[in-house]
Amino acid sequence: MNRIKQRLLTFMISAALVIGIFPAIPAIADTDDSTSSGESVYVLYTNDIHCEVSGYPALAAYRAQLLENGENVVTVDAGDAIQGEAIGAQTKGSAIIDIMNTVGYDYAIPGNHEFDYSLSTFLDLTKNADFTYLSANFVDLQTGSTVFTPYAVKDFDGKKAAFIGICTPETYTKSTPVYFQDENGNYLYSFSENTFYETIQNTIDQAREDGADIVIAVGHLG
């Protein structure tokens, strides 16, 4: 891990999106001020990292700076984080989960490549995550329930934001179909491909019923 940590010293911000949930809030807030209005929510997100870990230190540093300034911050990953480089293959994704824990992610969405080490391996990995995996449309057909929590609601100074996870219905073909089947080739899991839009809309409606003032869809699609 020492060599890994040395690699992480290269600073680069993977991505940052600022979402204002109150009227008249500028798109980008000035983070140099020592005081904060607390009226913005910073959603820091990463996507398709594919084990390219060099940007994580800057993301962690930026997140820490915002929190120190009293800002509301949520950090999310939109999928395909744990596969793509030797660090992922050699640890079957566990090293990336450890790094994401250190960064301080709140939520993550399973991308199609999260399943490349097998479904069971990924499900075991999620148990070691300090953040929550979300997916509204990844369903266990044996129970009829979603494998992960469909959405999560966070309260920011009295305003509530819901984060909905969306997996690509193409995960079957972009990963390994047999991982989602029994020994007879019957599918045990679904990505709600036949009811995709209805499933997502129903989840949005449920989040609204739970008091969400804003709904943010975090999807790994395409």
Task: Report residues per predicted region.
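Short, intrinsically disordered, low-complexity terminal segments
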Residues: M12-I13, A24-P26, K159, E209
